[in-house]
């Protein structure tokens, strides 16, 4: 089997991830709910995960990191906690439904939303950000990298635009956290949402968000916090402000271990390997007859994703053939990002997405490219 569906979830985790989770299950209590060793051990696990993520993302402190069940919950927390009826939000057609559906709900409640479009290659039309600005514009939310095309958003441009006009910038880093260097302070990001089970190498059921110090938002969920139990309102200090109830401590043990492994290897080195594998695959298939590749490959700095179609062949059928005949795991369909498919004309066909990890080998990539070329030749 060749696993090239890493944009959905990374399959191969470092051994330390499972070991950390097993240790938690055998020795940890409930963090913040006592003073005995098992609960203190759990608290140390949670803090370790915060600390490693703060280091990876160059956050001001571990307290800037709040945990959720996934990036979808993190994005809901940010958007629903910051946007009010009458506010205007600027976003893009590249977004995942984890951004779109919260915005649609907020629109039903009185918010307004504008969508920056893409050109025929899938690249954002950055001039439209200024075009869509209104007196009531409050927030900009963008994906760091499209989960469909792999194209990166120019965060330096978007951040400068947001800062110029006093807007809050929320970034969906589902495809980039752990896969490339990110410095939230240098980028001027106000909120950065991440998932644990992709490039951060943690287990499913983990995620969270970085929140810039001084930025406050209404919590999505309130309840048990382990502190200030006689107060009628949920605690307002970070990270407790955005965390209600018992955290997924086994998952956070694995996430902390995964991020620590990334830091030990160097995120720059891992990113360079993924970039090289992606470029190798692209160069081997770019001239295959009838193969249409989506996204811009003029620049090598992009997410490790190559999405394509074989002529008019249904993407789901092509993915089935890749699995059944070649043992290659890929993702086909709309990838939960409907607007980019509308923009690129692939609503009915979908796309076949290959996504790479530093865990993949050059031999695997070459075999996958060979399979693509064979299928293309067969027509």
Please identify what each model-predicted range represents.
Residues 1-379:
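Pyridoxal 5′-phosphate
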């Amino acid at each position: 089997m060749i696993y090239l569906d890493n944009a959905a979830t990374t399959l191969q985790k470092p051994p330390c991830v499972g070991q950390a989770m097993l240790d938690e299950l055998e020795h940890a209590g409930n963090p913040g709910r006592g003073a005995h060793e098992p609960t203190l051990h759990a608290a140390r696990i949670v803090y370790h995960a915060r600390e490693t993520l703060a280091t990876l993302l160059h956050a001001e402190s571990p307290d800037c990191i709040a945990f959720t069940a996934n990036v979808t919950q993190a994005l809901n927390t940010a958007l629903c906690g910051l946007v009010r009826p009458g506010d205007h939000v600027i976003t893009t057609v590249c977004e995942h439904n984890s951004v779109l559906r919260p915005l649609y709900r907020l629109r039903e409640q009185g918010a307004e939303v504008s969508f920056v479009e893409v050109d025929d290659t899938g690249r954002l039309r950055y001039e439209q950000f200024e075009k869509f600005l209104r007196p009531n514009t409050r927030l900009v939310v963008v994906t760091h990298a499209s989960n469909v095309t792999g194209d990166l958003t120019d965060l330096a441009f978007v951040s400068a635009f947001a800062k110029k006009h006093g807007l809050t910038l929320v970034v969906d880093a589902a495809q980039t956290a752990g896969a490339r260097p990110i410095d939230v302070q240098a980028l001027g990001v106000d909120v950065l949402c991440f998932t644990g089970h992709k490039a951060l190498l943690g287990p499913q059921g983990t995620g969270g968000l970085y929140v810039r110090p001084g930025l406050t938002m209404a919590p999505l969920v309130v309840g048990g916090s382990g502190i200030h139990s006689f107060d009628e309102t949920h605690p307002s200090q970070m990270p407790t402000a955005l965390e209600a109830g018992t955290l997924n401590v086994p998952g956070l043990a694995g996430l902390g271990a995964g991020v620590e492994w990334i830091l030990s290897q160097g995120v720059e080195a891992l990113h360079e390997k993924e970039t090289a594998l992606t470029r190798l695959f692209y160069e081997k298939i770019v001239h295959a007859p009838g193969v249409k590749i989506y996204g811009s490959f003029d620049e090598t700095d992009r997410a490790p994703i190559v999405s394509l179609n074989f002529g008019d062949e249904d993407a789901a059928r092509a993915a089935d053939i890749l699995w059944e005949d070649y043992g290659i795991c890929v993702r086909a369909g709309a990838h939960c990002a409907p607007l980019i498919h509308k923009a690129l004309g692939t609503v009915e066909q979908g796309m076949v997405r290959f996504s790479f990890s530093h865990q993949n080998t050059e031999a695997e990539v070459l075999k996958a490219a060979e399979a693509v070329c064979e299928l293309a030749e067969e027509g």
